[in-house]
């Protein structure tokens, strides 16, 4: 603990300032330090502001296109994950049939997913968007159409 009396105050203050500023300057000016991060954040904010202005300057259908792209990305991700799960279920089911033990039964109706996707895209293209949430459930309403994603799969594990 430093002794701050009238004889040692100046020397302790001098050495502590010299020590702190000696390490503060290299840390902040190397590009990865505090000043580098602030430059990166300023550039990011400028890019985001220009990007937002460009989106709003386009025609009103651009928001429709953004929603459509987002929905198609989400649907493709969902179907790819369902495909991987169905492949895993088939592999485990074959393994279970060899050992005469059924490990997983009835994962869900995945085969009709592409037909559902076409119907959903058709209904979306003819309707307007409004979204509401109630107690954590996401419900998407499109005029007279209400879509709620419900997982169909039920798994049973037998030991």
Swiss-Prot record:
Pfam families: YMF19, YMF19_C
Protein name, as recorded: Putative ATP synthase protein YMF19
PANTHER family: ATP SYNTHASE PROTEIN YMF19
Biological process annotations from GO: ATP biosynthetic process; proton transmembrane transport
Keyword terms of this UniProt record: ATP synthesis, ATP-binding, CF(0), Hydrogen ion transport, Ion transport, Membrane, Mitochondrion, Nucleotide-binding, Translocase, Transmembrane, Transmembrane helix, Transport
Main location: mitochondrion
Enzyme Commission number, as recorded: 7.1.2.2
One Gene Ontology cellular component: mitochondrial membrane
Transmembrane segments: 13-37
Subcellular locations according to the entry: Mitochondrion membrane
Signal peptide region: none
Keyword Transmembrane helix listed: yes
Biological role: This is one of the chains of the nonenzymatic component (CF(0) subunit) of the mitochondrial ATPase complex.
Keyword Cytoplasm tagged: no
Topology class, membrane: Single-pass membrane protein
Family: Belongs to the ATPase protein YMF19 family.
Catalytic activity: ATP + H2O + 4 H(+)(in) = ADP + phosphate + 5 H(+)(out)
């Amino acid at each position: 603990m430093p002794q701050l009396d009238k004889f040692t105050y100046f020397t302790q203050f001098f050495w502590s300032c010299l020590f702190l500023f000696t390490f503060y300057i290299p840390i902040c000016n190397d590009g990865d330090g505090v000043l580098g991060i602030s430059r990166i954040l300023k550039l990011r904010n400028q890019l985001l502001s220009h990007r937002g202005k460009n989106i709003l300057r386009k025609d009103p259908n651009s928001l429709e296109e953004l929603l459509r792209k987002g929905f198609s990305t989400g649907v493709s991700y969902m179907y790819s994950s369902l495909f991987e799960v169905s492949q895993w279920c088939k592999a485990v089911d074959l393994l279970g049939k060899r050992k005469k033990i059924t490990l997983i039964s009835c994962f869900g109706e995945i085969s009709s997913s592409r037909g559902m996707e076409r119907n959903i895209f058709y209904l979306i293209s003819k309707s307007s968007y409004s979204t509401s949430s109630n107690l954590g459930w996401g419900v998407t309403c499109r005029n007279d159409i209400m879509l709620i994603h419900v997982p169909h799969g039920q798994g049973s594990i037998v030991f």
